[in-house]
Amino acid sequence: MNEPGAKALFDKFGTYILPGRVDDPRRGIDEAIEAERIGLGAVWISERFALKEPAVLAGAVAEATDEIRINGTFYATMRHPLVTASIANMMQAMSGNRFGVMFARAVPAYMKMMGAP
């Protein structure tokens, strides 16, 4: 981890942790710690049903890191906007204002599986 109050060396650069399918999502915590250690400014976490829940992973990453920004990508059409806003608000409070949200369109197969229009 960076020294408290230290600025990330590559503040404008980030990395996508846990790409694709994962067997053990806890690996993302180690990836975020390493990203912060080498001076990256942000990590990105995507949503993938039954494999990756960005809010849960972001909470774990926030606890394990000190300075790095944590961004979660959520499917815009798969949960009520107030639920996503509530998650983001809580993550901002719990992470020391290091959390950001990005919205993505859901894959049609996921939408069908979840019964979404």
Which residue stretches match the model-derived regions?
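Glycine-rich "substrate-gating" loop/helix at the edge of Rossmann-like oxidoreductase active sites
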Residues: 75-79
